[in-house]
From Swiss-Prot:
Its EC number is 1.4.3.3. This is D-amino-acid oxidase. The gene is DAO. Belongs to the DAMOX/DASOX family. One of its GO terms (molecular function) is D-amino-acid dehydrogenase activity. Interacts with BSN (via coiled region); the interaction is direct and inhibits DAO enzyme activity. FAD binds at residues 8-11, 37-38, 43, 45, 49-51, 163-164, 182, 283, 312-313, 315-317. Phosphorylated in the cerebellum; probably not by PRKACA, PRKCA or PRKCE. May be S-nitrosylated, which partially inactivates the enzyme. The lineage of its organism: Eukaryota, Metazoa, Chordata, Craniata, Vertebrata.
Length: 347
């Protein structure tokens, strides 16, 4: 069976690996190819802050909460393994801060040691009157993509740098299944009015003295628009920019100033941090993740397409659960193909 995965960010590579791990023994051979116009270190995943934390509000699709939980448990199972260092995986603790009381998040029992902040702790953060503390996971995107790539190539999966302009150009080569993990660019392959780019700009800093993540929340501003700093495995990430429908890739000076000013208070402790770099990326924003299948006609034959995109700014948080779901869809395709080849019963 021939399978093509389009996209080489965390969604594309993890989905490819999950499908290959679950079905390579049942399909001999399983010929899998990954096409992408950008590979690590040039993907959005490479510069993501990497903290496992879903949105505070419940997702409109309840399955998304399950996919995030599955991802946390999958990563946590690796935390004491020899692979953790190569994956760029570590435990991290920190604070979510608010100006007024808010309901507990649905993921409070997924993370470790979730609790409300004490008054003494809140004294460390002037201007904030409510908050949480918990231990979560941090995943360095670049290290993780390299780890996934190595596992895929060891399995014989082929990776090619190629910009796919349409499903037809891939399906025409005798491909049985296409897995669409193109993120914010999915509309170029098939129009999707629900998909929008959510432009973000972050600053990477060398601040080894910052040991805990600090994420502030302002419901009036919306998600991603409040200051945050997230220590990483190698460098910290300073941010707080989100512009929906904005495509320019260059760094904007006003956004740089916004990030720096927002994280300039005494509790941020980033004033003297050395700036390592600054990046702009696009979150594939959609009301719900598109994770489903459809059939496309390519001449006389039909090609199955599994869509897996629209993860917003939390692809690393939800990737493995989505990969498992995509693999289930792949399994259903196999069952249907097997049934269609069975001779009819004469009973």
């Amino acid at each position: 069976m021939r399978v093509v995965v389009i996209g080489a960010g965390v969604i594309g590579l993890s989905t490819a690996l999950c499908i290959h791990e679950l079905y390579h023994s049942a399909l001999q051979p399983l010929d899998m190819t990954i096409y992408a116009d950008r590979f690590t270190p040039l993907t959005n995943t490479d510069v993501a802050a990497g903290l496992w934390q879903p949105y505070l509000s419940d997702p409109s699709n309840p399955q998304e909460a399950d996919w995030s939980r599955q991802t946390f448990n999958h990563l946590l199972s690796h935390i004491h393994s020899p692979s953790a260092e190569k994956m760029g995986l570590a435990l991290i603790s920190g604070y979510n801060l608010f100006r007024k009381a808010v309901p507990d998040p649905s993921w409070k029992d997924t993370v470790l040691g979730f609790r409300k902040l004490t008054l003494r702790e809140l004294d460390m953060f002037p201007g904030y009157s409510y908050g949480w503390f918990n231990t979560s996971l941090i995943l360095d995107g670049r290290s993780y993509l390299q780890w996934l790539t190595k596992r895929l190539t060891e399995r014989g999966v082929k990776l090619f740098q190629r910009k796919v302009e349409s499903f037809d150009e891939v399906a025409g080569g005798g491909v049985d299944v296409i897995v669409n993990c193109t993120g914010v660019w999915a509309s170029a392959l098939q129009p999707d009015p629900l998909l929008q780019p959510g432009r973000g700009q972050i600053i990477k800093v060398d601040a080894p003295w910052v040991k805990h993540f600090i994420i502030t929340h302002d419901p009036e501003s919306g998600i991603y628009k409040s200051p945050y700093i997230i220590p990483g495995v190698f460098n910290g990430t300073v941010g707080g920019i989100f512009k929906r429908g904005d495509y320019p890739e260059g760094n904007a000076s006003e956004n740089h100033s916004c990030c720096q000013t927002g994280c300039s208070g005494p509790h941020w402790r980033t004033k003297d941090a050395r700036i390592v770099g600054e990046w702009t990326g696009f979150r594939p924003v959609r009301p719900q993740i598109r994770l489903g299948r459809e059939q496309l006609s390519a001449g006389p034959s039909k090609t199955e397409v599994i869509h897996n995109y629209g993860h917003g700014g939390y692809g690393l948080t939800i990737h493995w659960g989505c990969a498992l779901e995509a693999a289930k869809l792949f399994g259903k395709i196999l069952e249907e193909k097997k049934s269609s080849r069975m001779p009819p019963s004469h009973l």
